[in-house]
Amino acid sequence: MDIRRIVLYMALALIGLSLWNAWQIDYPAKQPVEEKTASQLTSDGHLLPQIIPSNAEQPITLKAEEKASSSKQLIQVKTDVLDVDIDLKNGDIVKGLLLDYPLSVEDKNKPFPLLQNQASQRYVANSSLFILDGQTPQSLDFDFTSEKEYYELKSDQNQLIVTLNGKSEDGLDVKKEFVFTKGSYLIEVNYKIANTGNSLWKGYFNTQLLRSSPKEDKSSIFHIGSYTGASFSNPGKNRYQKVSFSDMSKSNLDVDAKGGWIAMQQHYFLSAWVPNADSENKFYTLATDKDYTIGAVSQPITVKPKEDKIVGSKLYIGPEITSVLKGISPSLDLTVDYGILWFLSSLLFSLMKAIYTVVGNWGWSIVLVTVLIKLAFYRLSATSYKSMASMRKLQPKLQALRERYGDDKAKISQATMELYKQEKVNPLGGCLPILIQIPVFIALYWVLLESVELRQAPFIFWINDLASADPYHVLPLIMGATMLIQQKLNPAPADPMQAKVMMFLPILFTGLFWNFPSGLVLYWIVNNTLSILQQWYITRKYSDEKPAKKVVATAK
């Protein structure tokens, strides 16, 4: 049995399995969570967490109300990259369109709706103030007013400030301010609280990302799913921690954090609340029958009579672009989920991006990166192919040993090892070079799967989206053909059954890659093609050298 080929194809299978199995692995250790308790659902639909006030030794027991409502009084804010709707009832952002990212290749004029407040799908960014009425959290509901119903960032403006005005019954004058910046998906959200009353005001600032249960994108051997769910960062303890919707349903997260961030993730896109780096907050999750929430509630805020105070946070609504996320908050770029080999994937993406700036096409960038990787591993691959060539030359002698010893496996094994020693051939010589390359292959896979830059990126001819499957499945068929050619270059197994199994593998991998993103299949085709050329060259060169040496030896 050809052990080298078995190990090789097992390694290839592991690559495929890693793509759909390791995707769901939460590689950091999980934070302890508290048992589920009741939560407070306010009249506007906000969920308030269980909190422990400074003057209480026990957590507050919360009660849930049954109804939630929202107003239809919306204002629209449009920048060069965002189109958002703000509900004047409490000033929640209930719609967020990403203007530079079309919904689909077929509908380029319709922007991708990251946030939306539809009956079928609810995904909104809430922020509010609340107080404690005894031991019960009481949300401060504001019917804000706005000077205009439509705001637009002009081409000659770098910043747009939208101010909502509101008053509370207990003497608070509140201005809720949204600061939009040209070319940015980051929104500053600030509450300017003025205490016009005669008594000390004490309350809390609460931010949330709330979404209804999305359609699950499960992984299988023929499809690679993407992570959709919540996550957070607690500096010094958890750089990046996922919290799946199933985890939320089982128990509530309860984490004290300084700085950090909370987020809702999906393939390519992200929403995140980023508190000030020096602010202390409690991160929490809550789940109802329909909605899942991750939130951050501040430490108590006090405002003396006739004084004012500003509290706020930053909200990101946009694509998962590593360079952008790095500049917003530490570890936020880890939401570009490159898996356990993220450090290697980051290097490969930087190389791809550098090539893209020159060639201007992500497809050709994939091709050139594959060529560079192949060049980097040229010597290792050459060692592997030389081993294959040696094994091919030994096939007649190995077959003669099998015919000579028949069913005596012990003698066949002993004679085979003596033959390897005599001919100075290592049967496993081709395995190690291939195994060393596997982490690089897997890391590049993650880059091609996770990078939003490849979403709807065209290549050539009919390939107009490298992140989607080839609509005509031509690339998977070409990939299968390259695998078949590679097999023809390898030494043929002496066992007929093993030969049939090996012939079936190209069909298996063609099916495996049938619905894979075109960028992944393109990478594999280029890699296989380069491997075929290198193997053919080395095998031919090796075969030409050996007979010459044999003639010289005979002449002597």
From Swiss-Prot:
Name of the protein in question: Membrane protein insertase YidC
Molecular function via GO: membrane insertase activity
UniProtKB keywords: Cell inner membrane, Cell membrane, Chaperone, Membrane, Protein transport, Transmembrane, Transmembrane helix, Transport
One family name in Pfam for this protein: YidC_periplas
Functional summary from the UniProt entry: Required for the insertion and/or proper folding and/or complex formation of integral membrane proteins into the membrane. Involved in integration of membrane proteins that insert both dependently and independently of the Sec translocase complex, as well as at least some lipoproteins. Aids folding of multispanning membrane proteins.
Location of the protein in the cell: Cell inner membrane
Chaperone listed as a keyword: yes
